[in-house]
């Protein structure tokens, strides 16, 4: 039971810090609402045209692909550090992991997810 005291303390401190930050933000936020506070701020100049702009979904697709392959690097680093200890089995597993990721990239490329339209 004493092993879980540290975990419980960590969770409680996390909740207190999160709730404390939200409470502090609520207590000190500016309360005056007027026309100028609700306008979109653009370099100190009045906005011209529509302030709500639609973004292409390709931005989301590229961001998602970046996150996927960025996470791949996170898994490659510990493998590279302990490469000698893992031996041939670790090498085969990592090649399988990279093959699955390359297969996913090939599929996305084949489906046209990486083409800018």
UniProtKB/Swiss-Prot annotation:
Give the UniProt subcellular location, in the record's own words.
Cell membrane
**According to its UniProt record, which reaction does this protein catalyse?**
a quinone + NADH + 5 H(+)(in) = a quinol + NAD(+) + 4 H(+)(out)
Q: What is its EC number?
A: 7.1.1.-
Q: Name one Pfam family in it.
A: Oxidored_q4
Q: Where are the transmembrane segments?
A: 4-24, 64-84, 86-106
Mode of membrane association: Multi-pass membrane protein
**GO MF annotation, one:** NADH:ubiquinone reductase (non-electrogenic) activity
Key word NADP present in the record? no
Q: Which InterPro entries does UniProt cross-reference here?
A: NAD(P)H_OxRDtase_bac/plastid, NADH_UbQ/plastoQ_OxRdtase_su3, NDAH_ubi_oxred_su3_sf
Q: Which UniProt keywords apply?
A: Cell membrane, Membrane, NAD, Quinone, Translocase, Transmembrane, Transmembrane helix, Transport
- Main site of residence? membrane
**Function recorded in the entry:** NDH-1 shuttles electrons from NADH, via FMN and iron-sulfur (Fe-S) centers, to quinones in the respiratory chain. The immediate electron acceptor for the enzyme in this species is believed to be a menaquinone. Couples the redox reaction to proton translocation (for every two electrons transferred, four hydrogen ions are translocated across the cytoplasmic membrane), and thus conserves the redox energy in a proton gradient.
Family designation: Belongs to the complex I subunit 3 family.
* Assembly with partners or alone: NDH-1 is composed of 14 different subunits. Subunits NuoA, H, J, K, L, M, N constitute the membrane sector of the complex.
Q: Which PANTHER family match?
A: NADH-UBIQUINONE OXIDOREDUCTASE CHAIN 3
Q: What name goes with this protein?
A: NADH-quinone oxidoreductase subunit A
């Amino acid at each position: 039971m004493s092993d879980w005291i540290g975990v419980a303390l960590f969770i409680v401190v996390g909740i207190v810090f999160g709730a404390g930050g939200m409470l502090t933000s609520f207590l000190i936020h500016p309360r005056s609402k007027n026309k100028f506070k609700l306008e979109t701020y653009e370099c100190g100049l009045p906005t011209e045209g529509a302030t709500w702009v639609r973004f292409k979904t390709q931005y989301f697709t590229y961001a998602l692909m970046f996150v996927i392959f960025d996470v791949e690097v996170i898994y490659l680093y510990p493998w590279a550090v302990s490469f000698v200890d893992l031996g041939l089995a670790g090498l085969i597993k990592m090649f399988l992991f990279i093959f699955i990721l390359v297969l996913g990239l090939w599929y996305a490329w084949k489906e046209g997810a990486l083409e800018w339209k």
